[in-house]
Amino acid sequence: MRNFFIALFSPLAPRLRRVHPNVLTLFSLLAGILAGISFALTGLAPLFFLVGGGFVALSGMGDSLDGIVARAHGRTSRTGDFLDHFADRLVDVAILAGLAFSRGAHAALGFILIVLALLHSYLGTQIEATLGRRSYAGTGKAELFVAFIAFTIPAYFLSAWYLRVGQHRLAFADLFMLALVLGTAISLVQRFRRGLQACMRADGGDR
């Protein structure tokens, strides 16, 4: 999915020659924060689900374009990479926290999801620090953004719907978070296993 978005947005790079990649990173961050705020406001009006989905799309576009523009115009830098990764984590937390406080949602599920998402991202960074190459194994941010955008449409129409499980009521957002928790947990295990195997192979090759 990541490669698909790189191919999709690469034609825009020549038009953005005068835009610094860090500006696109900041744009992605601001759009992500606004997405989280929008999801948190869905208790006031379900329309904010659709607004949040729009901001998620804009955030994802900015996140793809900053690296594309940097590579296309020779503006890659350690500073840009650092800012990009930090902004990515802030966007993750903002969007997931907004979902946790969305209409009818259980905040505890959102907290679990944030922890899993940060651990998943940390593993990729740690593999890069240990082996010198970034791991994008498992579910990535591109897939997460697509899932969020797809979620917002039924969430708007099903904002008053609940699933009763015993004495508990689960909103549509809860079911979405449960699916994300399961998917992220599976991806986390896969990334850990592949990273560990890569480290063990590297250790064997050094002997």
Locations of the language-model features?
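Basic, amphipathic juxtamembrane/active-site segments
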Residues: 67-109
